[in-house]
């Protein structure tokens, strides 16, 4: 592997589409290898922009604007970090020889819940929750009746649990609330929602799956808790039998093989008894995987970059650990962070994302903790996160 010098004609260049906290860590890893970094997002001073060589603010669903930047920069690797992107342009650029991570087709299929759910259930026959799609309130009422209450309603495109709610009855007012909530939290164009069967699972995991030039490798399973579809804490390793880990890996391998390309995939799975049930997959680092910054010899971000570049990936768990999200309780531009109490918690680290605008409930940072046991790590991570005061 030959790497050039950033800002010179021989430099190796990556361009991130989406510049949030996950993209920020990818760029930090790239900077360590002397890679030129360009960050793109819909708002200025996004986290990854703060550590990139250059940045652009555009609507990434605007095909002309997106194409103009890609043609201007001519990056070696185009790395989508969010779903709300004009993937038709990515397919076009890939046809002209640009490398899209993992592939333009994978980005298109996984950009919304409909594409990936139909691939998993209807093409690959992978077990999933029962589901229906709806494009109007009337269609949603019929779908809820067919699936049965309780059920989950989500926009087909959203992030961090936005727009997701549980319909607890078949009453019109409950369904109407879910419809309006989904529309308010949706990304992209269109009104379509997915209605999913409510699964009483034993636990849910993220299986970080890396497709590399040397084969597919897996991180130890990551357990996590979500609140309204938004991750609030994760831990690694989650205890599982070897048999169940093998089942999970086989399912992850099946779906990531079809998606193709190299890079890390966040495969979300429900575990119920001896069943593994597919939930979702993202062809990029996963928010629950931030715990790997303290638990593994390579974080998910380093794994992603090394996989993209064709470098060896040797994953080792070095400690039990946990992450706990730091959410804002206020709405403020350019907030400040009092970390005086947080830094007193032993064996913890803070990652403040640097988002320019704090909103109530917005994820502004994460606390990481290592310990001899997952239980101790979870306790310390939460204590550290709760010790951060946003002002």
UniProtKB/Swiss-Prot annotation:
<feature type="binding site">
    <location>
        <position position="113"/>
    </location>
    <ligand>
        <name>ATP</name>
    </ligand>
</feature>
<feature type="domain" description="ATP-grasp">
    <location>
        <begin position="118"/>
        <end position="309"/>
    </location>
</feature>
<keyword id="KW-0436">Ligase</keyword>
<dbReference type="GO" id="GO:0006189">
    <property type="term" value="P:'de novo' IMP biosynthetic process"/>
</dbReference>
<dbReference type="GO" id="GO:0005524">
    <property type="term" value="F:ATP binding"/>
</dbReference>
<dbReference type="InterPro" id="IPR011761">
    <property type="entry name" value="ATP-grasp"/>
</dbReference>
<keyword id="KW-0479">Metal-binding</keyword>
<dbReference type="GO" id="GO:0043815">
    <property type="term" value="F:phosphoribosylglycinamide formyltransferase 2 activity"/>
</dbReference>
<comment type="pathway">
    <text>Purine metabolism; IMP biosynthesis via de novo pathway; N(2)-formyl-N(1)-(5-phospho-D-ribosyl)glycinamide from N(1)-(5-phospho-D-ribosyl)glycinamide (formate route): step 1/1.</text>
</comment>
<comment type="similarity">
    <text>Belongs to the PurK/PurT family.</text>
</comment>
<dbReference type="InterPro" id="IPR011054">
    <property type="entry name" value="Rudment_hybrid_motif"/>
</dbReference>
<feature type="binding site">
    <location>
        <position position="204"/>
    </location>
    <ligand>
        <name>ATP</name>
    </ligand>
</feature>
<dbReference type="Pfam" id="PF22660">
    <property type="entry name" value="RS_preATP-grasp-like"/>
</dbReference>
<feature type="binding site">
    <location>
        <begin position="159"/>
        <end position="164"/>
    </location>
    <ligand>
        <name>ATP</name>
    </ligand>
</feature>
<dbReference type="Pfam" id="PF21244">
    <property type="entry name" value="PurT_C"/>
</dbReference>
<comment type="subunit">
    <text>Homodimer.</text>
</comment>
<feature type="binding site">
    <location>
        <position position="355"/>
    </location>
    <ligand>
        <name>N(1)-(5-phospho-beta-D-ribosyl)glycinamide</name>
    </ligand>
</feature>
<keyword id="KW-0547">Nucleotide-binding</keyword>
<dbReference type="InterPro" id="IPR013815">
    <property type="entry name" value="ATP_grasp_subdomain_1"/>
</dbReference>
<comment type="function">
    <text>Involved in the de novo purine biosynthesis. Catalyzes the transfer of formate to 5-phospho-ribosyl-glycinamide (GAR), producing 5-phospho-ribosyl-N-formylglycinamide (FGAR). Formate is provided by PurU via hydrolysis of 10-formyl-tetrahydrofolate.</text>
</comment>
<feature type="binding site">
    <location>
        <begin position="21"/>
        <end position="22"/>
    </location>
    <ligand>
        <name>N(1)-(5-phospho-beta-D-ribosyl)glycinamide</name>
    </ligand>
</feature>
<keyword id="KW-0067">ATP-binding</keyword>
<dbReference type="GO" id="GO:0005829">
    <property type="term" value="C:cytosol"/>
</dbReference>
<dbReference type="InterPro" id="IPR054350">
    <property type="entry name" value="PurT/PurK_preATP-grasp"/>
</dbReference>
<feature type="binding site">
    <location>
        <position position="280"/>
    </location>
    <ligand>
        <name>Mg(2+)</name>
    </ligand>
</feature>
<feature type="binding site">
    <location>
        <position position="154"/>
    </location>
    <ligand>
        <name>ATP</name>
    </ligand>
</feature>
<dbReference type="GO" id="GO:0004644">
    <property type="term" value="F:phosphoribosylglycinamide formyltransferase activity"/>
</dbReference>
<feature type="binding site">
    <location>
        <position position="81"/>
    </location>
    <ligand>
        <name>N(1)-(5-phospho-beta-D-ribosyl)glycinamide</name>
    </ligand>
</feature>
<feature type="binding site">
    <location>
        <position position="287"/>
    </location>
    <ligand>
        <name>N(1)-(5-phospho-beta-D-ribosyl)glycinamide</name>
    </ligand>
</feature>
<dbReference type="InterPro" id="IPR016185">
    <property type="entry name" value="PreATP-grasp_dom_sf"/>
</dbReference>
<feature type="binding site">
    <location>
        <begin position="362"/>
        <end position="363"/>
    </location>
    <ligand>
        <name>N(1)-(5-phospho-beta-D-ribosyl)glycinamide</name>
    </ligand>
</feature>
<keyword id="KW-0460">Magnesium</keyword>
<keyword id="KW-0658">Purine biosynthesis</keyword>
<protein>
    <recommendedName>
        <fullName>Formate-dependent phosphoribosylglycinamide formyltransferase</fullName>
        <ecNumber>6.3.1.21</ecNumber>
    </recommendedName>
</protein>
<dbReference type="Pfam" id="PF02222">
    <property type="entry name" value="ATP-grasp"/>
</dbReference>
<dbReference type="GO" id="GO:0000287">
    <property type="term" value="F:magnesium ion binding"/>
</dbReference>
<feature type="binding site">
    <location>
        <position position="268"/>
    </location>
    <ligand>
        <name>Mg(2+)</name>
    </ligand>
</feature>
<dbReference type="InterPro" id="IPR003135">
    <property type="entry name" value="ATP-grasp_carboxylate-amine"/>
</dbReference>
<dbReference type="InterPro" id="IPR048740">
    <property type="entry name" value="PurT_C"/>
</dbReference>
<feature type="binding site">
    <location>
        <begin position="196"/>
        <end position="199"/>
    </location>
    <ligand>
        <name>ATP</name>
    </ligand>
</feature>
<dbReference type="InterPro" id="IPR005862">
    <property type="entry name" value="PurT"/>
</dbReference>
